[in-house]
């Protein structure tokens, strides 16, 4: 009887682990800007588009915009280690949550770009 209970517990544990793993993977997939933003972007405007952004997910969002619209101008500030490859949008990695000199300079670049 002990062996049977151990097998049942092991089987239940494996099924629960599989369900939790699938839920986790689905949550990660649906939170990926490449999967969500791309679906909701309108057609690219015919006029100049400038993308600006800040935050940990902003570089991936910029990458998604360029995936759909092609090369765009812009600057995005993200946390160190969160940079993504973009064709035209400049991705600047800076400190978070406490700003560093790189973040301050990047913010100044955004202000200059918008003028």
Could you say what each language-model-derived stretch is?
Residues 5-115:
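Non-transmembrane, aqueous-exposed alpha-helical and coiled segments at domain scale
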